[in-house]
């Protein structure tokens, strides 16, 4: 019995402790006792020069050179987790596959944030500024690192669409047309202007102030009835660059509402007071209007230079597609009223016909 016990003990020690195994790594055979743990084997061979991965911030910067995933070990294709290395022994000959650790990104929170739309606004091409594409905010995923406290932009969920505004100088091919426009009305002079236009079978565009529209609703209704175009010139003629975005929007929204109430016309055509409407104003208000119409022939009638000078400014500088600025309100417009018949007469003599802003844009394919 003693001999059997000693023999069994010797066999056990040989089988599980003294026996030499052949462990192949990277094509090279290494010897290891049967009681060698994976941890000891890796330590004895310096992890076969494999390194753990790095711990990276959400921005991809190294926070800890060895803070990433540990070296990966497989024995005959079976994964051995790092937590099991200390109590996993080799029981047979085999192949150990050792893979460097992979990088690990720090723990982080994931947020979805609005990405404000960009702008592509060119206001140097002519007097008619048109929205060709509305801006739309994008949506993007952002990671906020718990260790680094940094924020990194990641997956784009919805791409932002830029606000595109282009400006044009309408020149209808094969035509000789002109757009007469009147600002600051309606007023006590509006009916006189409308009488002249009617007598001469001429159409025009009226950029009206909301507060004036409410005061003269019958004039607004006559403008529409006789085939002219009504558009907005704000409520009270403020200087937009000095206003907050909220104030600007309120001014335009109120003017559109006033015009609708007085004339039953819904318009998205606008002329900024003083022509002061730049990139910031477009960014603030592009969802309210489709066009901002300036001018390229200015009569300067608001200075009251005399009816002959007002007429001369138009006749001397007229061209196909011209947008002429005149005033039907905002002060004494008697000179404008007196000049208008002669302006129409001379322009007709030159072969011009008269159109509204809507008609001009349509003729020019805008």
Locations of the language-model features?
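Ser/Thr/Pro/Gly-rich low-complexity linker/stalk segments immediately outside membranes or between
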Residues: 13-30
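Catalytic domains of cell-wall/extracellular-matrix polysaccharide-remodeling enzymes
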Residues: 215, 238-353, 358-366
